[in-house]
A protein has these predicted regions:
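Collagenous Gly-X-Y triple-helix signature in extracellular proteins
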Residues: 1-207
């Protein structure tokens, strides 16, 4: 028989950055902190299959948000309202120490046959990062699955007082001109119209 326990320690973002650099951070470590508006959030440290470290929101922000004010996925991630919201409004809510340590991450999507790249400090995850390789992955050629999402139950997130909830991904639905992918409340993927508001769970990388 065994008992499994966990420990909680105070730390700083600079210490976490050093842990990423020297390899002492552990897959699945959870970092809890407050946004400048007082909201408490947690991010989980995880690697992709190439060994790159990411920090991913454990649950959604309290407020839901649409991908675009209009029901369109034209321009995909690069052109969507959500991208501007995360990299302006939400980024400004992060602690100053964390802001200074976040590295711009290159996001690559194939949109209408063309390679489109953006540099983002905060970003939604792609369908490939959450669900692994599939028919959609040719449109996300640089992405691999994050290790924190290998099990279906690990893709479930809560949103404010809603309990388990739907949360957006940055991947546009190829068969539709109006939809992006999202994760439903029991951890599988579908897509819906971009103007609907669902949960927001961003990721970032450190310098």
């Amino acid at each position: 028989m065994f008992i499994k326990t966990s420990t909680t320690n105070e730390t700083t973002w600079a210490t976490l950055k050093a842990a990423v650099d020297n390899g002492t951070i552990a897959q699945g470590d959870l970092v809890i902190f407050n946004l400048k508006n007082g909201e408490e959030v947690a991010v989980r440290a995880t690697q992709d299959r190439n060994g790159k470290w990411f920090f991913v929101l454990e649950d959604c922000l309290a407020d839901e948000r649409c991908m675009n004010k209009r029901g369109t996925n034209k321009g995909a991630w690069a052109a969507c309202d959500m991208r501007q919201y995360l990299n302006n409004t939400v980024f400004a809510l992060l602690p100053d120490e964390l802001q200074a340590l976040i590295a711009p991450t290159t996001i690559v999507q194939i949109v209408d046959g063309e390679r489109v790249e953006t540099e983002d400090k905060l970003f939604l995850l792609s369908k490939t990062q959450v669900f692994g390789k599939g028919r959609w992955s040719d449109r996300e050629p640089e992405d691999t699955q994050l290790l924190c999402f290998l099990r279906e139950k690990d893709r479930v997130k809560e949103c404010g007082d809603n309990g388990t909830w739907w949360w957006w991904l940055r991947s546009p639905e190829a068969s539709s001109s109006s939809s992006f992918a999202y994760v439903i409340s029991h951890g599988i993927s579908t897509n819906y119209i971009a103007s609907y508001s669902y949960g927001v769970a961003f990721g970032f990388c450190l310098i």
